[in-house]
């Protein structure tokens, strides 16, 4: 039920989220994390990119504008509709993680698979990562940007577990925040390795205003 609440929250807040992203209301993204994930993908020099959990499509669009062939997929039809309506050289499809876990994407493989703040669950994420090697072209890279555990932990104990979500700092247009599964840095690395992936790089984009990590980016390859 907890994983279902994540999808329900994103369906409820699809329009509000799209507005916040396109109006550049999320300061940490403007100052640090948007540019960081674009650079992380571009540095791999991919021809083809899969944006898993693409949301309203900003990253897929940004990468397509740089000449990459991009497919964005998301479980929320309203977000894919927003991505399509914005106009882009990227392609978009509705697909949830369960579908991808079960059957991949019809045998399609990509030079880069990227998940940008899109891995909030527990078992679903572990199962999805186990599928990633099947989605990568030879020498392909899997890139994840997520909340930095040391910063996101706050005053709670530094151990894996479900946390209640919050829309603190967002507009009143948001409601029903989604729960999310907190992982330590060690747990992220262990999960990547357990999925048949080899961590080749870790980046910690720093917010220039707070001078603290705004996120962590993992770059991995199939073993």
Residue ranges, per PLM feature:
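Conserved class I S-adenosyl-L-methionine
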Residues: 1-44, 58-59, 82, 143-170
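A short glycine-rich, Lys/Arg-flanked "PGG" loop and its adjoining helix->strand segment in the class I
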Residues: 126-141
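A short SAM/SAH-binding and catalytic strip from SAM-dependent methyltransferases
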Residues: 112-126
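Core SAM-dependent methyltransferase catalytic element
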Residues: 210-223
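Short alpha-helix
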Residues: 179-199
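A short acidic, Gly/Pro-enriched loop at the edge of an enzyme's catalytic core
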Residues: 102-113
């Amino acid at each position: 039920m907890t994983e279902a609440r994540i999808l329900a929250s994103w369906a409820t807040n699809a329009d509000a989220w799209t507005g916040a992203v396109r109006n550049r209301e999320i300061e940490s993204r403007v100052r640090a994390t948007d540019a960081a994930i674009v650079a992380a993908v571009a540095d791999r020099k991919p021809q083809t990119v899969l944006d898993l959990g693409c949301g309203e499509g900003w990253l897929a669009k940004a990468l397509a504008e740089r000449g990459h062939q991009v497919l964005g997929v998301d479980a929320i039809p309203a977000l894919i509709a927003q991505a399509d309506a914005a106009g882009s050289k990227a392609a978009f499809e509705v697909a949830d993680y369960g579908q991808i876990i079960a059957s991949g994407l019809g045998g399609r493989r990509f030079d880069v698979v990227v998940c940008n703040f899109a891995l909030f669950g527990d078992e679903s994420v572990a199962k999805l990562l186990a599928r990633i090697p099947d989605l990568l072209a030879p020498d392909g890279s899997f890139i994840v940007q997520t909340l930095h555990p040391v910063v996101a932990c706050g005053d709670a104990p530094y151990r894996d577990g479900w946390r209640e979500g919050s829309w603190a700092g967002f507009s009143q247009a948001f409601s029903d925040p989604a729960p999310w599964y907190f992982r330590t840095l060690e747990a992220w690395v262990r999960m990547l390795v357990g999925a048949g992936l080899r961590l080749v790089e870790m980046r910690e984009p720093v917010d220039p205003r707070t001078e603290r990590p705004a996120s962590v980016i993992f770059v991995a390859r199939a073993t």
